[in-house]
Amino acid sequence: WSLNDYLGLANHPEVRKADTEAAAQYGAAYPMGARMMSGHTKYHEQLENELAAFVMKESAYLLNFGYQGMVSIIDALVTRNDVIVYDVDGHACIIDGVRLHSGKRFTYKHNDIESMEKNLQRATKIATETGGGILFITEGVFGMRGQQGKLKEIVEMKKKYNFRLLVDDAHGFGTLGKTGAGAGEEQDCQDGIDVYFSTFAKSMANIGAFVAADKDIIDYLKYNLRSQMFAKALPMIQTVGSLKRLQLLRDNPGLKDKLWENVNALQNGLRSKGFNIGDTNTCVTPVYLEGSVPEAMVMVNDLRENYGIFLSIVIY
């Protein structure tokens, strides 16, 4: 009940076989170098090309970690003259990436269109004065609440305000959209996302991440992402293993169908029993409880010890 393994790929026999064979052939260390030096292989390039095609972008670039990658992407995309506008409920990697920004930044109320517009107006005024641009950041799926980001409405606002849209779709990739390409595909606005980011830690049941965008943006990021320039390339076990995972995700829509069968059964069952799961419209299923932390811990322990159900609590 607390796992990231949305599609069940972690224990899929073909995945385990691919991981085992990659480990036997390459070990844990290879390649011994950064991508810009000696760490580039045909498998890294193949995975990037397949990921870009899957999420309908021109180019993609592999990242060693999701959290670290997003922090570095934000740092690379803006200068002190630029303005960042982002959702107040953004993931920690977004918040920490924004903290590195030496220019102005504004938060808007969670998924609130009116608040978005108000802050875009403020950002536009400042960017006009500084000669900079605006980076707008949101999530495809908010991992605590389970709501989709209002991507379609945000993309529509690009007609009125001049900004670049960065979307963290960690929970949408593989779970939403006709082909599993994420929240942008689900909302029919994938083309309007300028910079698309996702991790391998959810649907792909692996370690690593990627960013996808137009080729000129990716070429720029390759030489400006400090988290990648000064780190080894993604190991071969993760790279080759991710190729197999992506193949299974792409070629087996039944994986996503089964996920949603389970999600609907769970969410409908919880609602029918009177549990408050908010207004989630994704696989993320929060159960909001009133009471104290000690009471919540008693419930968690009871479910684990007496019912064989393991879950976690999140405290605000």
Residues of each region from the PLM?
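Conserved active-site segment immediately N-terminal to the catalytic lysine
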Residues: 161-162, 182-200, 219, 223
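N-terminal "arm"/small-domain region of PLP-dependent enzymes with the aminotransferase-like
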Residues: 1-29, 163
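Conserved PLP-binding catalytic core of the aspartate aminotransferase-like
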Residues: 9, 257-267, 272-306
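Conserved PLP-anchoring active-site segment centered on the Schiff-base-forming lysine
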Residues: 73-92
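Conserved PLP cofactor-binding pocket of PLP-dependent enzymes
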Residues: 29-31, 36-37, 280, 284, ...
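Active-site phosphate-binding strand-loop segment of PLP-dependent enzymes
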Residues: 5, 106, 110-166
